[in-house]
Amino acid sequence: MASTIQALPQEVVYLITAGEVIDSFAAVVRELVENSLDAGANRIVVYLWPQQWRVRVADNGCGMNLDDLQQAASAHSTSKIRSSADLWKIHSLGFRGEALHSLTTLADVEIISRAPENVGWRVVYGDSGKAVHVEATAIAPGTVVTVSNLFASCAARRQGLPTTAQQMKAVQATIQQIALCHPQTTWQVWQNDRIWFTISPAATAGQLIPQFLPQLRPSDLQEIKLEIPNPENPQLSTNNKPNASALALVVGLPDRCHRHRPDWVRVAINGRMIKLPELEQTILAAFHRTLPRDRYPLCFVHLLISPDQINWNRNPAKTEIYLHDLSYWQEQVTQAINQALRISAANIPESVQTTRVSQLLKAAEEKGNYNFNPRNANPADNTQNYLKAVAQVSNTYIVAEHPGGMWLVEQHIAHERVLYEQLCDNWRLIPVEPPIILYQLSPAQVAQLQRIGLDIDIFGEQLWAVRNLPAMLQQREDCAEAILELSWGGDLQTAQVAVACRSAIRNGTPMSLPEMQKLLDDWQRTRNPRTCPHGRPIYLSLDESSLSRFFRRHWVIGKSHGI
């Protein structure tokens, strides 16, 4: 009986491979601009003609000589790696040698390129990736790749693609993601011979994001960059470069910006945006109890780590990877986010007005020099108070002075943040005598109280006795109402938030200056001082220079006004 299993013809193999690598306009743009970045380009121009199924990418990179041009579109040809050992030393965006060859299988491809000190060449490629036409041409150093008649040989592929508008939206998202990882690059994108959008270069990703989200102000973002040891030997000094990695982080400050979906929870590794659900969940967990309900953070994490920590050989688009010691990197990301959310002069140039106040003052954003002492700081450093209590307004807001201006702090939610973090660190239940009697609890309410650790048993018909309670509620007169509130569901953290909220100083409560100062000191030492556990902003800050401009003090300095 003849065998039914046969080797596929080479052209079928290439067509299958091409379909895995190139599946859309966005994939074409992604592969071509990644080649441009690998060539050292810092200016990239993308031309799109979606109705003609044509894409062109031009760059000012290093270009190619004639020998490389003739080989560039051959199957599995690359300048990035030479052996299997090089798979663990990848510093480039591309390395498979499949993209250009796949494009020649699915479209007509032409490349014009010139290396410095050489003449330029134009090469047209056939279906197999071989050069079928070569001619000298005039071109500035760099490369121009034109892909025409995309998917002409795959009518079903064209019909299965989304609408033109959706494809162009995907192209824009792809370019923005790549630009975020390479902020020093200038981008210009044309559609149907008209300029579509541009991206100006920036020193950092944090300076680039407002170009994508115009409603954001630079002061809404906090950006830090940390050197961290590789997990093989975390005890080694980070000054030992071969054993050190870097973590660049941009976060939207939770008291100023958040989103209705997690579309800006993004992770990049070594210049490429990736999908890593474990790290994305780590980011969301780090922002827990800092944002309003059903809101999500703006957070971009870019890990620059040793190539031997990554296995890129998981997905043809290289958007999914295997990352070694994942738990270690999760811990580093959590610590970096916690550091970024603190109010520290070492890492936050504080912008001080909300949009409404900024419009009132008609002043540009200014940077203050605030700081606070984190929980794990040296106790000797805790002697300096960055905020000095001055007064209380409406028995609700604490007016605080600092070297750069003044703050208004709402006393209830500041105290709520302090108590919540204390409860998270030490959830302590104490016996209560006589027991607190509750009436007409449902089985679900009883189960909820038992789930958070309360000792509750039947005391009579429709009566239950609670024999312990959270220590913070001990001195309150409304213990029964507080416990009843805890019975309505939620996890332990929800219960801790409820206890903190009920135990915190009420708005409308007069406070002495020493009491206000102690609250400010305690609040400055919290891990997440910007918002309460419900996500509300705790403070409003006004810097001295903005106040001076509003009162026009700089107009009269030096004149005879006695000022």
From Swiss-Prot:
Instruction: Provide GO CC annotations from the record.
Output: mismatch repair complex
Q: Looking at the record's lineage, which domain of life comes first?
A: Bacteria
Keyword entries, A-Z: DNA damage, DNA repair
Q: Name one Pfam family in it.
A: HATPase_c_3
Q: Name one GO biological process term.
A: mismatch repair
Q: Does the keyword DNA repair apply?
A: yes
Signal sequence segment: none
Query: InterPro entries, alphabetically?
Result: DNA_mismatch_repair_CS, DNA_mismatch_repair_MutL, DNA_mismatch_S5_2-like, HATPase_C_sf, MutL/Mlh/PMS, MutL/Mlh/Pms-like, MutL_C, MutL_C_dimsub
Positions the record marks as coiled coil are none
- Entries under PROSITE patterns matching the protein: DNA_MISMATCH_REPAIR_1
UniProt GO MF annotations: ATP binding; ATP hydrolysis activity; ATP-dependent DNA damage sensor activity; mismatched DNA binding
Q: Which family does it belong to?
A: Belongs to the DNA mismatch repair MutL/HexB family.
Summary of the function given for this chain in its UniProt record? This protein is involved in the repair of mismatches in DNA. It is required for dam-dependent methyl-directed DNA mismatch repair. May act as a 'molecular matchmaker', a protein that promotes the formation of a stable complex between two or more DNA-binding proteins in an ATP-dependent manner without itself being part of a final effector complex.
Q: What NCBIfam families has UniProt attached to this entry? A: mutl, PRK00095.2-1
Q: What is this protein called?
A: DNA mismatch repair protein MutL
Q: Which organism is it from?
A: Nostoc sp. (strain PCC 7120 / SAG 25.82 / UTEX 2576)
Instruction: List the gene name.
Output: mutL
